From Swiss-Prot:
The lineage of its organism: Bacteria, Pseudomonadati, Pseudomonadota, Gammaproteobacteria, Moraxellales. Belongs to the RecR family. Residues 79-174 form the Toprim domain. The keyword Ribonucleoprotein does not apply. Pfam families: RecR_C, RecR_HhH, RecR_ZnF, Toprim_4. SMART domains: TOPRIM (SM00493). A zinc finger (C4-type) spans 56-71. This is Recombination protein RecR. One of its GO terms (molecular function) is zinc ion binding. May play a role in DNA repair. It seems to be involved in an RecBC-independent recombinational process of DNA repair. It may act with RecF and RecO. Disulfide bonds: none annotated.
Length: 197
């Protein structure tokens, strides 16, 4: 719009989730008019991240080194292994400060419609890991979508001979949720997964 380089900046900003044309233009203008030093720092941080952040060899999350800090932490409980779809899921669980076990990132979920099969995920590595390093409990923390449920079922079948206890995250009523506003599927899951007080 203004210059070829400006248009290129806007185009690249648009690859971020939730950023459309107008938002990208506002960001570009803001960086160029008011925040040039911060824009340069952002460019440097982005360059370093793209170059230096790698996949952890053990859990397949992100790391600055071959093995991430969570996998290196001796205070983590080796008896618990939480299987998630993405590194974002690891971050979400860590923010709860309620889980002290290990993680394993699948790299997505099964989705035949999108052409994503078990071979496209880290499922084979997961099976190998639980064979080599037995765990007491494998927690399947995949999404509640059809794809997430299918992935959890597939993993359960693949590891059940090697793990004594395979569990799934509880599903149902969110904290502070009003029953009248819940969809019938969520409410049905909550009724099926009710717990003792």
């Amino acid at each position: 719009m203004l210059t070829a380089k400006f248009d290129q900046l806007v185009k690249q900003l648009r690859i971020l989730p939730g950023v459309g044309q107008k938002s990208a233009q506002r960001m570009a203008l803001h960086l160029l008019t008011k925040k040039r030093p911060q824009g340069m720092a952002l460019a440097q941080a982005l360059d370093e991240a793209m170059r230096d952040i790698v996949e952890c060899q053990r859990c397949h999350s992100f790391s600055d080194d071959a093995v991430c800090p969570l996998c290196q932490d001796p205070r983590r409980d080796d008896a618990l292994l939480c299987v998630v779809e993405t590194a974002a899921d690891v971050m979400a669980i860590e923010q709860t400060a309620g889980y002290r076990g290990r993680y394993f990132v699948l790299g997505g979920h099964l989705s035949p419609i999108d052409g994503i099969s078990a071979d496209d995920l880290n499922i084979e590595q997961l099976v190998w890991r639980v064979k080599q390093e037995p765990v007491e409990e494998l927690i399947l923390a995949t999404g509640t979508t059809v794809e997430g449920q299918t992935t959890a079922h597939f993993i359960n079948e693949a590891v059940s001979r090697h793990v004594n206890k395979v569990t799934r995250l509880a599903q149902g009523v969110p904290m502070g949720g009003e029953l009248e506003y819940l969809d019938s599927m969520t409410l049905g899951q909550a009724m099926q997964n009710r717990s003792f007080l």
